[in-house]
């Protein structure tokens, strides 16, 4: 490997908006501010919403259904 061509790989601090602080190693060179992390992301916390919206056929049937037919 050639010397002097690789970026510095150093320890930085990544701070999440929820207050979680992590020490990570990166070539970025400055501290990071994150929007979400593993402690506050809905997928990892189990508070994920199921957004099961109907498709075009469901909207059509809802709009043009005859009242009292079901």
UniProtKB/Swiss-Prot annotation:
Its cofactor is Zn(2+). One of its GO terms (molecular function) is structural constituent of ribosome. GO terms for biological process: translation. PROSITE patterns: RIBOSOMAL_L31 (PS01143). Binds 1 zinc ion per subunit. One of its GO terms (cellular component) is ribosome. Coiled coil: none annotated. Zn(2+) binds at residues 16, 18, 37, 40. Belongs to the bacterial ribosomal protein bL31 family. Type A subfamily. Binds the 23S rRNA. Part of the 50S ribosomal subunit. This is Large ribosomal subunit protein bL31. It comes from Klebsiella pneumoniae (strain 342). The gene is rpmE.
